[in-house]
Structures are given as C-alpha cells and as structure tokens.
Design a protein with these regions (language model features):
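Mid/C-terminal beta-alpha module of Rossmann-like enzyme folds, strongest
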Residues: 194-241, 245-246
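NAD(P)H-binding glycine-rich loop region in Rossmannoid oxidoreductase-like domains
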Residues: 35, 45-83, 111
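NAD(P)-dependent short-chain dehydrogenase/reductase
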Residues: 141-189
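C-terminal amphipathic/interface module of NAD(P)-dependent oxidoreductases
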Residues: 229-270
C-alpha cells in the first residue's frame, strides 16, 4: 500500500508519518521545503495549488490522508484558499489520476455549533461562522459529493509527543475560554490508530469523531503544563462547546490507547 500524506511537516503530520512508516505503510508526501523525512518516504515537491505536483503525488497511490490545513491566522483569504481550494484541487487530482484510492480527510471539532445541547455528533446540523471551521466544512462537503471512496475524521484538541500545543493554552486560554470549559482531547498516538483503521476501510463513507474518554477543563490543562488561570464560578455559556460524542468511533472499533490527558502526563507522553 502506498499512501500520500499531505501536511506531513505540520503539527500532526510530523508525528503521524513515522508511525505510518513503522506500521509498514509506504508513504509519499507533498512538501514544499527540505524538511527531513523518515527513511523510505518519497517526497513530491509542490503544494495543493499546483496541478502538476498534485497529479504526480496521487498517481499510483492506494490512499490519501489529507491533513494539510491553514488556521490560527488573520488572513482569511489564505484560510479559504488552502483549506477549500487546495482540498478541491486534491480531490480533482484524485478523481483524474487515482479514482479508486481511499481519500481520508482530517477535520475539526470546531465545526459543531457554539450553542449545542449535547456533545457534537457527526450528523448534527453544522453552520460554523469562524473561517477555519467553515472552510473545513466546505471541504468536507466537496469530498462527500466527489464520488470517491471517502472518510472524514474530526479531531478535537490534539496534543502529545512534546508538540507544544498544550503549552500554547497558557497564552490562548485567558480571555478566550471559561476555566471550567471542558475540551475533548486526542493524543497523537490515537490519531495514528484512527488513521490506520481508516486505511483499512473501517470508516469508509462516514464522518467519525475521534477523541479520548475524558473531556478536560481548560483550568486543569493549563495547570498541567505549569501555567495558571484565573478561577471562576460564573455559569458557562455552553458547557458542550468543543466536546464531541465518540459513540460511533467506539462502535466501529476505535479505542483510544491514551484514554485521558492525565494518563499521558503520568506516562510522560505530553
């Protein structure tokens, strides 16, 4: 099996790629720079806006894992260009050059409504107003109507393997999150486990939420990495915001190896 991985040099991709290689997956990457890659990985130079590079990248692959995305920028045009137009280009290249390939797209828990009455479910109506989740939802819809063999994995707050993401909460959380807000979480190990299940066809034709077993308060997360946050007993605007219902994933066979962020801390996996 040869798999194309986009976003291989990003936060998730740099941790997923070596795990795929260790699992015996032959990997190809779409990269712009000269970042070091694991032995045996075949780089294709280019990006999601280059038709020639995309054709070369997808030709001969059995599957595509599409991680590449733009977020945490004020450049909304860039968000839409990369997340929607780039995804659309990759889908078109796959239709033309690898129509039987399995296409796995990474997406986000931010798609779910701010005022949800329960943890986000895959079949909930979604109409996000922020550009990042709105662009990801638009890309999801492009894939779902493409005629390809697709699956979509929605991830919540990703952490672990010393990626620095938890540490960033010490700067991001104050003023943005209520300290009692609980976030669904997923460790990089379990992203890899979900990706391998997707490559085997477990999630074909489905949107699937992938998270661990214990949404954790922002207050606890900040303290876990040595930060501090002003406590509050004020009511939460919506206690379900950024939480996901993962019942479907469990029914389909996904079980997180890292069940909680506290387990990760105890096992030095942060």
């Amino acid at each position: 099996m040869t798999v194309l991985l986009t976003g291989a040099t990003g936060l998730v991709g740099t941790r997923l790629l070596p795990r795929l290689v260790a699992h015996g997956v032959r990997c190809r990457t779409l990269v712009r720079g000269d970042n070091p890659l694991p032995d045996g990985v075949d780089p294709v130079r280019g990006d999601l806006l280059e038709a020639g590079a995309l054709a070369a990248a997808v030709t001969g692959v059995s599957a595509i894992i599409h991680l590449a995305a733009t977020f945490r920028t004020t450049d909304t045009d860039l968000i839409w260009k990369n997340n929607l137009e780039g995804s659309r280009n990759l889908i078109a290249a796959t239709q033309a050059n690898a129509p039987r390939a399995r296409f796995i797209m990474a997406s986000t828990a931010w798609i779910y409504a701010d005022d949800a009455e329960h943890p986000g479910r895959e079949d909930d109506p979604a109409a996000p107003t922020l550009d990042y989740p709105a662009s990801k939802l638009a890309a999801e819809n492009e894939l779902r109507s493409s005629g390809l063999n697709w699956s979509i994995l929605r991830f919540p707050f990703v952490y672990g393997d010393k990626d620095g993401h938890l540490e960033s909460l010490t700067q991001l959380a104050p003023g943005r999150f209520h300290p009692a807000q609980r976030l669904s979480m997923v460790h990089h190990r379990d992203i890899a486990a979900a990706a391998i299940l997707a490559l085997d066809g477990t999630f074909d034709g489905r949107i699937v939420n992938i998270a661990d077993e214990a949404p954790t308060s922002v207050y606890e997360l900040v303290e876990l990495v040595g930060g501090s946050m002003e406590p509050s007993s004020k009511p939460l605007t919506n206690p379900w915001h950024i939480q996901m219902d993962c019942s479907l994933a469990r029914r389909l066979g996904f079980q997180p190896e890292v069940r909680t962020v506290h387990q990760a801390a105890q096992q030095d996996l942060l």
